[in-house]
């Protein structure tokens, strides 16, 4: 009975006590640091979107120079590479046209992308490939930043604005001297039309990216990729026979360019669509300016077209701006829980 008295309920000092762990020192073995979503999106846009798309413009110009391949016919060949995605959607049991509640927006996204690509392919046939890509990417970056501010109230940091300003300045340095040809009669008129088409292509691209960010349903990416091919064929096939003359490529070089354009454009489409869901659309478009640098290199080494010193200086400014944007967004997310 005496042992049950509270004064006798003392700890047994004869037994060793368990080792104590400081409560203030968390364990370092239960969390990892991985790249953030914005970092992943920007790297995908840089490596998969910008670099692959940089080959599309010069290859399109090569196909036009060797076989006089019309822009709408090139768009048809590109859309054909998107149609096999229907097999993936059927295999997964998803509707080909997307859920009924978002079907209109998905079709609008496809129409804007087809318009953007059609304008881009038409522009590279009348102006140098590097300049056409420059104007298109510059307008898409500026329009994406303005649309994000107006529609989403999504601001940017000071470093991001610095990178956007630098990349746009680099594009102006590249394309500015070429605007002097606008005063050379009929040639200048076609040149002006090419720059206008490139600008409209960038505007349509920025609108399409904003619409894609509002689509949230399973298999969104393969659905919009398939719709791009479907809508592109519906628009370009009648337009080819009404506005242009169909040409069947006869040489191996033309067919190689057509296949390369289709595959590289599909890779770029998928990567850009993924990246814009992870990072700010204006930053994604700014990183895609790497396409301009690749196009200028191919313009000089493959197409043997003149690259002015202003092109080289502008390309350097663009690369520096991309480095600023990428470095500012290099952050990591901690994975896992920290134990106390």
Curated annotation (Swiss-Prot):
Keywords, alphabetical: Membrane, Repeat, Transmembrane, Transmembrane helix
Membrane topology listed for this record: Multi-pass membrane protein
One Pfam family recorded for the sequence: EamA
Protein name (database record): Solute carrier family 35 member G3
Cellular localisation: Membrane
Natural source organism: Mus musculus
Cellular compartments per GO CC: membrane
Chain coiled-coil ranges: none
């Amino acid at each position: 009975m005496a042992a049950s008295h509270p004064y006798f309920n003392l700890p047994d000092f004869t037994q060793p006590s368990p080792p104590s762990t400081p409560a203030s020192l968390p364990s370092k073995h239960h969390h990892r640091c991985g790249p953030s979503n914005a970092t992943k999106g920007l790297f995908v846009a840089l490596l998969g979107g910008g670099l692959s798309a940089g080959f599309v413009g010069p290859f399109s110009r090569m196909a036009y120079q060797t076989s006089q391949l019309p822009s709408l016919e090139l768009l048809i060949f590109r859309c054909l590479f998107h149609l096999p995605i229907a097999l993936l959607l059927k295999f997964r049991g998803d509707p080909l046209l997307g859920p009924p509640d978002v079907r209109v927006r998905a079709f609008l996204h496809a129409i804007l992308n087809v318009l953007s690509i059609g304008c881009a392919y038409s522009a590279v046939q009348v102006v140098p490939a590097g300049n056409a890509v420059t104007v298109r990417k510059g307008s898409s970056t500026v329009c994406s930043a303005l649309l994000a501010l107006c529609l989403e109230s999504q601001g940017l940091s000071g470093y991001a604005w610095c990178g956007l300003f630098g990349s746009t300045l680099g594009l102006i340095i590249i394309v500015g001297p070429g605007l002097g040809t606008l005063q050379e009669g009929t040639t200048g008129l076609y040149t002006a039309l090419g720059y206008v088409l490139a600008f409209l292509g960038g505007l349509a691209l920025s609108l399409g990216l904003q619409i894609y960010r509002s689509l949230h349903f399973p298999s969104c990416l393969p659905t919009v990729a398939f719709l791009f091919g479907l809508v592109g064929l519906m628009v370009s096939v009648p337009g080819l026979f009404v506005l242009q003359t169909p040409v069947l490529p006869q040489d191996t070089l033309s067919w190689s360019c057509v296949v390369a354009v289709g595959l590289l454009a599909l890779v770029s489409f998928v990567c850009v669509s993924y990246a814009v869901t992870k990072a700010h659309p204006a930053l994604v478009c700014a990183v895609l300016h790497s396409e301009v640098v690749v196009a200028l290199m191919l313009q000089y080494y493959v197409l043997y077209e003149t690259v002015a010193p202003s092109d080289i200086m502008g390309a350097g400014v663009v690369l520096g701006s991309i480095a600023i944007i990428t470095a500012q967004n290099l952050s990591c997310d901690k994975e896992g829980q920290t134990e106390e």
